[in-house]
Amino acid sequence: MAKSYDPAMHSAEHVLNAVMVRRFGCARCFSTHINPGKSKVDFRFPRDLSPEEARAVEEEVNAELSRGLAVSARPMPREEAARRFNLSRLPADAGEELRIVYVGDPVAPVDACPCIGEHVENTLQCGHFTWCSHEFTPPAEGENLGVLRVRFRAGN
């Protein structure tokens, strides 16, 4: 991992993904840049978000983080993971056994996905999540989804 990598920010990003998928029915982000000061994620999205929607996502992420959920990782055969998750962001050499990160109870997690990154042990270690800004780039001609870029912070 990079010297400036922030496990709390990364774990908060997992919860942000879960909230966005649950609230809007979109796919998980397709691009992520995790930094200690401010991070950003990009979602394929059909429209811009209103300020009220952004605040609601921020509140929901904070509600999940404040539950003190365990963050754990378990191995899963690649074949099973391919049936349950989108593996397109994994490196080709990830192997036949993948590491699945769970936020919350692995039986009914708030979030679960293949991930090679470092994480906190409990969501309380993420601190407060702040939705700093977002911008929407409309879809290119012939496409139905644009890009919603979200910038956020986590920590105390």
PLM regions: where:
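Active-/binding-site microenvironments in catalytic and ligand-binding cores
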Residues: 1-156
